[in-house]
């Protein structure tokens, strides 16, 4: 049975799924050299009254090629699942990601859940071949790079 025959057979059983990633015209990759380079991207997060979790997609040259809002939560939490974080990153053929979320109450200290999420994403990214470069926490008081403040979360390979 060839793939054409298989497709004909399967279309009577289940619908074929098609996923597409649509890039905005005119957007150009933006190089990232350090966490401060992301300030212009995360600035809007500082003003939200509910938690938002965002993933920035990078190419092999550490240039931001896209982003997606993974989740929008409550004033104190945002549900984040690795599947949702990496779905768009894989579709975008991302080499790496940087994730960021806001703390509406103003704290820049990572919660135990923030640490656990970071560890889970790093492990999932390693399995998928998409590196997690950093996890930023932002608030009206500034931003905090977990890569800089908690380097032990990133195992040396």
Predicted features by range, described:
Residues 1-18, 59-61, 71, 75-157:
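Active-site-proximal loop/helix of nucleotide/amide-processing enzymes and allied scaffolds
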Residues 12-69:
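Long amphipathic N-terminal alpha/beta scaffold segment
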């Amino acid at each position: 049975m060839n793939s054409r025959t298989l497709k004909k057979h399967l279309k009577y059983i289940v619908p074929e799924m098609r996923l597409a990633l649509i890039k905005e015209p005119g957007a150009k990759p933006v190089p990232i050299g350090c966490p401060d380079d992301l300030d212009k991207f995360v600035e809007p997060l500082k003003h939200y009254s509910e938690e938002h979790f965002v993933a920035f997609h990078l190419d092999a040259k550490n240039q931001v090629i896209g982003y997606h809002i993974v989740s929008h939560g409550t004033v104190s939490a945002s549900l984040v699942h690795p599947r949702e974080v990496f779905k768009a990153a894989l579709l975008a053929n991302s080499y790496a990601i940087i994730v960021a979320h806001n703390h509406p109450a103003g704290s820049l200290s990572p919660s135990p859940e923030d640490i656990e999420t970071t560890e889970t994403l790093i492990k999932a990214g390693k399995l998928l071949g998409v590196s997690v470069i950093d996890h930023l926490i932002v608030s009206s008081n500034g931003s905090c790079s977990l890569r800089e403040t908690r380097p032990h979360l990133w195992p040396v390979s």
